[in-house]
Amino acid sequence: MSKLSKNGLSKISNKTVIFKFKNETIAIAVNEWMENPEKAEAKYGHISKWDTSQVTTMNRLFFKATLFNEPIDEWDMSNVTDMSYMFSNATTFNQSIGNWDVSKVTTMKYLFSNATTFNQPIEEWDVSNVRNMESMFSASVFNQLLNSWDVSNVLNMDRMFAFSN
Protein backbone atom coordinates (compact mmCIF):
# COMPACT_ATOMS: atom_id res chain seq x y z
CA MET A 1 0.00 0.00 0.00
CA SER A 2 1.29 3.46 -0.81
CA LYS A 3 1.32 6.57 1.33
CA LEU A 4 0.95 10.01 -0.17
CA SER A 5 3.23 12.59 1.37
CA LYS A 6 2.74 16.36 1.52
CA ASN A 7 4.93 16.93 -1.55
CA GLY A 8 2.95 14.55 -3.76
CA LEU A 9 5.41 11.66 -3.72
CA SER A 10 4.06 8.20 -3.14
CA LYS A 11 6.50 5.41 -2.30
CA ILE A 12 5.21 2.01 -3.36
CA SER A 13 8.42 0.03 -3.03
CA ASN A 14 12.09 0.79 -2.56
CA LYS A 15 12.41 1.63 -6.26
CA THR A 16 9.03 2.92 -7.42
CA VAL A 17 8.06 6.52 -6.87
CA ILE A 18 4.91 8.08 -8.29
CA PHE A 19 4.45 11.82 -8.21
CA LYS A 20 0.88 13.13 -8.23
CA PHE A 21 1.14 16.42 -10.07
CA LYS A 22 -0.94 19.51 -9.42
CA ASN A 23 -1.10 22.70 -11.49
CA GLU A 24 1.87 24.23 -9.65
CA THR A 25 4.13 21.20 -9.84
CA ILE A 26 3.49 20.06 -13.43
CA ALA A 27 4.90 23.27 -14.92
CA ILE A 28 8.00 23.06 -12.73
CA ALA A 29 8.55 19.41 -13.63
CA VAL A 30 8.16 20.04 -17.38
CA ASN A 31 10.68 22.89 -17.19
CA GLU A 32 13.08 20.59 -15.35
CA TRP A 33 12.49 17.91 -18.02
CA MET A 34 13.34 20.39 -20.78
CA GLU A 35 16.56 21.42 -19.04
CA ASN A 36 17.73 17.94 -18.01
CA PRO A 37 15.54 14.91 -18.82
CA GLU A 38 17.74 12.45 -16.91
CA LYS A 39 17.67 14.51 -13.73
CA ALA A 40 13.90 15.07 -14.01
CA GLU A 41 13.32 11.37 -14.63
CA ALA A 42 15.29 10.49 -11.51
CA LYS A 43 13.13 12.91 -9.53
CA TYR A 44 9.65 12.29 -11.04
CA GLY A 45 9.91 9.16 -13.18
CA HIS A 46 9.64 9.11 -16.97
CA ILE A 47 7.42 11.87 -18.35
CA SER A 48 5.27 9.30 -20.17
CA LYS A 49 4.14 7.86 -16.83
CA TRP A 50 3.45 11.05 -14.86
CA ASP A 51 0.21 11.10 -12.87
CA THR A 52 -1.61 14.19 -14.16
CA SER A 53 -5.03 13.20 -12.83
CA GLN A 54 -5.21 16.22 -10.48
CA VAL A 55 -4.07 18.80 -13.03
CA THR A 56 -6.72 21.21 -14.33
CA THR A 57 -4.60 23.49 -16.52
CA MET A 58 -2.04 22.61 -19.14
CA ASN A 59 -1.79 26.25 -20.26
CA ARG A 60 1.55 26.85 -22.05
CA LEU A 61 2.98 23.60 -20.69
CA PHE A 62 5.05 22.84 -23.80
CA PHE A 63 5.00 26.38 -25.23
CA LYS A 64 8.12 26.87 -27.37
CA ALA A 65 9.38 23.39 -26.42
CA THR A 66 11.08 23.05 -29.78
CA LEU A 67 12.84 19.75 -29.02
CA PHE A 68 10.08 17.98 -27.08
CA ASN A 69 8.69 14.80 -28.67
CA GLU A 70 8.07 12.35 -25.84
CA PRO A 71 5.11 9.95 -25.68
CA ILE A 72 2.57 11.39 -23.23
CA ASP A 73 -0.48 9.52 -24.48
CA GLU A 74 -0.99 7.88 -21.06
CA TRP A 75 -1.47 11.20 -19.28
CA ASP A 76 -4.81 11.45 -17.47
CA MET A 77 -6.38 14.61 -18.87
CA SER A 78 -9.84 13.95 -17.42
CA ASN A 79 -9.79 16.97 -15.06
CA VAL A 80 -8.13 19.44 -17.40
CA THR A 81 -10.21 22.49 -18.36
CA ASP A 82 -7.55 24.68 -20.02
CA MET A 83 -5.26 23.55 -22.84
CA SER A 84 -4.44 27.05 -24.15
CA TYR A 85 -1.09 27.25 -25.94
CA MET A 86 -0.16 23.77 -24.64
CA PHE A 87 1.80 22.80 -27.77
CA SER A 88 2.07 26.24 -29.35
CA ASN A 89 5.45 26.56 -31.08
CA ALA A 90 6.36 23.00 -30.05
CA THR A 91 7.85 22.45 -33.47
CA THR A 92 9.00 18.83 -33.01
CA PHE A 93 6.08 17.29 -31.11
CA ASN A 94 4.20 14.65 -33.12
CA GLN A 95 3.03 11.99 -30.69
CA SER A 96 -0.28 10.15 -30.50
CA ILE A 97 -2.63 11.87 -28.03
CA GLY A 98 -5.94 10.92 -29.63
CA ASN A 99 -7.00 8.78 -26.67
CA TRP A 100 -6.97 11.67 -24.17
CA ASP A 101 -10.18 12.40 -22.27
CA VAL A 102 -10.57 16.14 -22.91
CA SER A 103 -14.29 16.21 -22.15
CA LYS A 104 -13.93 18.88 -19.41
CA VAL A 105 -11.77 21.23 -21.46
CA THR A 106 -13.37 24.62 -22.13
CA THR A 107 -10.50 26.39 -23.88
CA MET A 108 -8.18 25.10 -26.58
CA LYS A 109 -7.10 28.46 -27.99
CA TYR A 110 -3.72 28.36 -29.75
CA LEU A 111 -3.34 24.71 -28.68
CA PHE A 112 -1.34 23.65 -31.76
CA SER A 113 -0.53 27.10 -33.13
CA ASN A 114 2.81 26.98 -34.96
CA ALA A 115 3.18 23.31 -34.06
CA THR A 116 4.81 22.70 -37.41
CA THR A 117 5.13 18.90 -37.10
CA PHE A 118 2.02 17.75 -35.23
CA ASN A 119 -0.31 15.73 -37.47
CA GLN A 120 -1.91 13.01 -35.36
CA PRO A 121 -5.57 11.90 -35.34
CA ILE A 122 -7.59 13.56 -32.56
CA GLU A 123 -11.02 13.01 -34.09
CA GLU A 124 -12.16 10.95 -31.09
CA TRP A 125 -11.71 13.85 -28.67
CA ASP A 126 -14.92 14.92 -26.94
CA VAL A 127 -14.79 18.70 -27.45
CA SER A 128 -18.45 19.30 -26.62
CA ASN A 129 -17.59 21.57 -23.65
CA VAL A 130 -15.01 23.68 -25.47
CA ARG A 131 -15.97 27.35 -25.81
CA ASN A 132 -12.77 28.77 -27.32
CA MET A 133 -10.85 27.31 -30.28
CA GLU A 134 -9.29 30.57 -31.43
CA SER A 135 -6.21 29.94 -33.60
CA MET A 136 -6.16 26.33 -32.41
CA PHE A 137 -4.39 25.03 -35.53
CA SER A 138 -3.05 28.32 -36.93
CA ALA A 139 0.20 28.05 -38.88
CA SER A 140 0.32 24.28 -38.42
CA VAL A 141 0.55 21.27 -40.74
CA PHE A 142 -2.36 19.48 -39.06
CA ASN A 143 -4.39 17.61 -41.67
CA GLN A 144 -6.69 15.12 -39.94
CA LEU A 145 -10.44 14.54 -39.88
CA LEU A 146 -12.46 16.40 -37.27
CA ASN A 147 -15.93 15.79 -38.68
CA SER A 148 -17.13 13.90 -35.59
CA TRP A 149 -16.45 16.86 -33.29
CA ASP A 150 -19.44 18.46 -31.59
CA VAL A 151 -18.53 22.15 -31.73
CA SER A 152 -22.02 23.43 -30.94
CA ASN A 153 -20.82 25.14 -27.74
CA VAL A 154 -17.81 26.86 -29.28
CA LEU A 155 -18.16 30.65 -29.15
CA ASN A 156 -14.82 31.60 -30.70
CA MET A 157 -13.28 29.94 -33.76
CA ASP A 158 -11.46 33.05 -34.99
CA ARG A 159 -8.46 32.14 -37.15
CA MET A 160 -8.79 28.49 -36.12
CA PHE A 161 -6.91 27.32 -39.23
CA ALA A 162 -5.26 30.61 -40.27
CA PHE A 163 -2.01 30.19 -42.21
CA SER A 164 -2.28 26.39 -42.03
CA ASN A 165 -1.23 24.10 -44.84
Task: Tell me what each language-model feature is.
Residues 2-165:
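Negatively charged
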